[in-house]
Amino acid sequence: RISGIGKAGNPDVQPNVDIVIGPGTEVVAGEGKIVTAGGIDTHIHFICPQQAEEGLCSGLTTFIGGGTGPVAGSNATTVTPGVWNMSRMLEAVDDLPINVGLFGKGCVSKPEALREQIEAGAVGLKLHEDWGATPAAINNCMNVADEMDIQVAI
């Protein structure tokens, strides 16, 4: 993690120290480089586990999206639909060397199905016009997200 930018050292023996460091501090020289704590892909179609390695190689540390693996639905959508699929996908991504958040499907007009997906582990809900983002569905999704303090992707 990046904890600071500036002149690091021991202020007892060096002048103008901005960041006090100790014997357990890892220092990375970043002159002339772009240094980031890690990128976040917020629109990932979970198709295969190899995506984690590809993401890490390009500086990503977090995937947020959805899918159920190598099926047509994952190509078309970035949600993991339903409690059963959410549970299976959470098991599948548990050992990946990357942070993962799964979206549940948000286009429903009754709140129970949304709550079930969140309780099963969804970090957020996704609304999409292809699934019937009617005013009632949008209102329902936003109300449940507010009630359960989660994000909505529209």
UniProtKB/Swiss-Prot annotation:
GO terms for cellular component: cytoplasm. Binds 2 nickel ions per subunit. Pfam families: Amidohydro_1 (PF01979), Urease_alpha (PF00449). Its cofactor is Ni cation. It catalyses: urea + 2 H2O + H(+) = hydrogencarbonate + 2 NH4(+). Residues 38-154 form the Urease domain. Its main location: cytoplasm. Substrate binds at residue 128. Ni(2+) 2 binds at residues 43, 45, 126. Keywords: Cytoplasm, Hydrolase, Metal-binding, Nickel. It is found in: Cytoplasm. GO terms for molecular function: nickel cation binding; urease activity. Pathway: Nitrogen metabolism; urea degradation; CO(2) and NH(3) from urea (urease route): step 1/1. SUPFAM superfamilies: Composite domain of metallo-dependent hydrolases, Metallo-dependent hydrolases. Its EC number is 3.5.1.5. The modification N6-carboxylysine is found at residue 126. Carboxylation allows a single lysine to coordinate two nickel ions. PANTHER family: UREASE. Heterotrimer of UreA (gamma), UreB (beta) and UreC (alpha) subunits. Three heterotrimers associate to form the active enzyme. This is Urease subunit alpha. It comes from Photobacterium damselae subsp. damselae (Listonella damsela).
